[in-house]
A protein has these predicted regions:
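Residue-level detector of intrinsically disordered, flexible termini
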Residues: 8-9, 90, 94, 104-105
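STAS-typified acidic loop motif
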Residues: 2-31, 48-49
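General small-molecule cofactor/ligand-binding pocket signal
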Residues: 4-6, 78, 100
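Amphipathic alpha-helical interaction surfaces in cytosolic regulatory modules
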Residues: 23-97
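A charged, well-structured terminal subsegment
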Residues: 98-112
Length: 112
């Protein structure tokens, strides 16, 4: 599991995750992800290169969203593939965290 950070316009931070977001992957990215969560308030999490999403990974995303929301910020999930999107829907995550298919749609949520 790889994690990369890009700064977008309007103070938006894009976190790009790549690989299997299984338990091992979640453990690898949890600390750097939590550091980003504590420092930034508008975050797009790009899951387009994530091939698998485990329950521990869902927890990492949910906890991050709750922390950001508690500080008045927002987190949006970007471009999950069909399998990952299905897992998010099944877990009810799409009702808790906005999920968008394009970067422009994701950034629009964060700037509204």
């Amino acid at each position: 599991m790889d994690i990369a950070v890009e700064e977008l316009a309007a103070g938006i931070t894009k976190v790009v995750l790549r690989g299997r977001f299984d338990t091992t992957g979640a453990v690898l990215v949890e600390l750097p992800f939590n550091k980003i969560i504590t420092e930034k308030s508008r975050i797009v999490v790009d899951l387009s290169a994530v091939s698998f999403l485990a329950s521990y990974a869902i927890r990492v995303l949910l906890v991050g969203a709750k922390i950001i929301n508690g500080r008045g910020g927002k987190l949006v999930i970007l471009c999950p593939d069909n399998n990952v999107a299905k897992v998010l829907r099944t877990a009810g995550m799409d009702a808790l965290i906005p999920v968008r298919q394009t970067e422009s749609a994701a950034t629009a949520v964060l700037t509204s």
